[in-house]
A protein has these predicted regions:
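N-terminal Rossmann-fold NAD(P) dinucleotide-binding loop
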Residues: 2-3
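Gly/Ala-rich phosphate-binding loop of Rossmann-like dinucleotide-binding domains
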Residues: 6, 10-11, 147
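Glycine-rich FAD pyrophosphate-binding loop
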Residues: 10-31
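Central helical "cap/lid" subdomain
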Residues: 27, 179-236
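Dinucleotide-binding Rossmann-like beta1-alpha1 core, especially the glycine-rich loop
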Residues: 35-114, 246-248
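A short, glycine/Asx- and small/polar-enriched loop/turn
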Residues: 84, 115-123, 165-172
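Helical element adjacent to the flavin cofactor pocket in flavoenzyme catalytic cores
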Residues: 127-185, 193
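Active-site lid/adjacent beta-loop-alpha segment flanking the redox-cofactor pocket in flavoenzymes
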Residues: 204, 220-273
Length: 273
């Protein structure tokens, strides 16, 4: 998020932009640990409008920034089992359509036809959007970073924000592990750490971090030497999410990527397996 903001501000003509990265490598936090999904299927108008802009950027990323990001628009499919979930998604579906999202409402037969590996048990309906997809997070980060630097953005690595200086209610500086930086404008692009940055200026940002696990299972080689593409349905490239259990999966390289949230997981920055 930080490199994207820096790049777009520089494109608009802003100068003296400094991006602070606490780690040695860009994207070493939640960005580098995510599954790379990008979707339009959200429940709030603001999220949908932002995502429409984001998908537009990803679709023209290579042409505009010269960086391949392996953006595959194979779609997201949400599987719906509970009656309450069905009602919520119907409202979301209507909002998404009103805002121009090419989302489809699928009955059970159509959902199973598009994703033959799923079970019909308890399934009531599904939603699908073909503009949703997956990109390589590292390539997106590096593409934005390189383009931002070409426009004059300074990127400081291994520099941690430790405080924000104020004069009355106006920002005067950023306090960092490498010393203060005078500024009157700060963009909080800290992701899961946004709440901690907000507290430096007595602002409550309602963001909480939760540990999640992603697994990748290799598919055994075929005795006849057939490639994975020839042995699996194209539907396995769809990022399929069982909304009520949070289980999701999609094909990843020569295997299957899958994950699931733990409803009892407490909020923390814990990253152990």
């Amino acid at each position: 998020m930080g490199v994207s903001v820096a790049y777009h501000l520089a494109r608009l003509g802003m100068q003296n932009i400094v991006l602070l990265e606490r780690e040695q490598l860009l994207g070493a936090g939640s960005t580098g640990k995510c599954a790379g999904g990008a979707r339009l299927q959200f429940s709030s108008e603001s999220n949908i409008r932002l995502s429409l802009e984001s998908i537009d950027i990803l679709e023209r990323f290579e042409d505009e920034l010269g960086q391949s990001i392996d953006f595959r628009q194979d779609g997201y499919m949400f599987l719906l089992s509970e009656a309450s979930t069905l009602d919520t998604f119907r409202k979301n579906f209507e909002l998404q359509q009103r805002l121009g999202v090419p989302v489809e409402w699928l009955d059970v037969d159509e959902a199973c036809r598009r994703a033959p590996g799923i079970t019909r048990e308890n399934l009531r309906a599904a939603t699908f959007c073909g503009r949703d997809g997956i990109a390589d997070p590292n390539s997106v980060t590096m593409g934005f970073a390189k383009a931002a630097q070409q426009l004059g953005v300074t990127i400081e690595r291994e520099v941690e924000v430790t405080g924000i200086g104020l004069d009355a209610d106006r920002i005067t500086e950023i306090q960092t592990s490498a010393g203060p930086i005078e500024t009157r404008i700060v963009v909080n692009a800290a992701g899961p750490w946004s709440h901690q940055i907000g507290q430096m200026v007595a602002t409550n940002i309602p963001v909480q971090p939760f540990r999640r696990h992603i697994f990748i299972a290799d598919v055994p080689p075929d005795p006849k030497g057939l490639a994975l593409e020839a042995r699996t349905s194209p539907s396995t490239r769809i990022l399929t999410i069982d909304f009520d259990t949070t289980f999701y999966f999609h094909r990843e390289s020569t295997g299957i990527l899958f994950g699931m949230g733990d409803p009892d997981e407490p909020s923390s920055f814990e990253q152990s397996v």
